[in-house]
Amino acid sequence: MTVFALGGCTGAKNTFEIEDPRGLVSSATLRLCGSETPLAREADRLTLTRSIACEGDGEIRLVYEDGGSRHCIIGYVTPDAKQDWHFRADQSSCHHFT
């Protein structure tokens, strides 16, 4: 019982991932719940894993090496639900895939 109670307090971990196989993106920032959190680069991907403490929607703002920007739209999120968001960046847009 105690393990369940402690596990319930931590919240589900959600993954936000941008595939950047061509190295076009210089940075990516998750905007969600009134805050901004940068994604970390790992080879050809930018990733972030965190719990979500709000209901609503958000976006990941991509800043490209050439100074341009794009927005990856995050759909509706809810606290304590495991949700993973995967996108692929190209020169003109951000594509969501599962």
Placement of each model-derived feature along the sequence:
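Sec-dependent bacterial lipoprotein signal peptides
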Residues: M1-G7
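Bacterial signal peptide processing site
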Residues: G8-A12
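Asparagine-centered strand-capping/turn motif at beta-strand->loop junctions
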Residues: N14-L24
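Short, ordered, surface-exposed loop/turn motifs in non-cytosolic proteins
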Residues: G23-G34
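Short beta-strand segments within Ig-like beta-sandwich modules, predominantly Fibronectin type-III
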Residues: T37-A43
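Exposed aromatic-hydrophobic patches
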Residues: L46-S51
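A short, solvent-exposed beta-strand micro-motif common in secreted/extracellular proteins
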Residues: E55-D66
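Extracellular beta-sheet/turn segments enriched in Thr/Pro/Gly and aliphatic residues
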Residues: R70-T98
